[in-house]
Amino acid sequence: MLGGVLIVCHANLCRSPMAEYVARELLTRQLGGEASAVPVASAGTHAVPGYPMHPHAARLTAERGTDPEAFRSRPLHAEQLRTAGLILTATRAQRTTCVSLAPSALHRTFTLRQFARLATAAAEQGVVEQCWAAPDGRRDPVRRLDAAVAAASRARAGLQPPVRPEDDDLTDPVGLPIAEFRHCVREIERALRPTVGLIAVSG
């Protein structure tokens, strides 16, 4: 059984670490003590290991009440992709990179915004209950991600892609003012709310 959410961006200094911390925060709100059954990690397709979070990203993370001091960047490896239950990327290009590294992860790999659309559609279409992992119909927290991915995949069949494919990408704010980082973290939270909501009701 696969497990955990892996969030991927380019350098693992801004988008993916901010998303990692926001995802943990939202999971804790939704699941309380059960959030530990859904671990969240991040990595970068071109990351250099051991760097702290970008200063603007660290400041915004701290403003949300989480201490980012322990964070260190780490490069993406195929084994991470093979074992993650759900892989969320900042961009379509990074999604392609992930699948190239680990073809078996194809059906578990989405951009953050893409999975948010699918999670919203799954809730609207009422397909979540069809995807409970426990054969006797009881909710099983350990299998939340399997059920959430299955529900999103079912919803995909009836959902049109965005008119502009780039709308599934999350813009990199590195090199821009902190206002752009604030916008980025708002977009991350907007994408993660339906995602975490789907995970919460799928177990």
Set out the residue ranges of the language-model regions.
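Phosphate-binding/catalytic loops
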Residues: 99-203
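Conserved active-site segments centered on acidic
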Residues: 1-84, 92-107, 197-203
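Acidic side chains
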Residues: 67, 85, 168-172
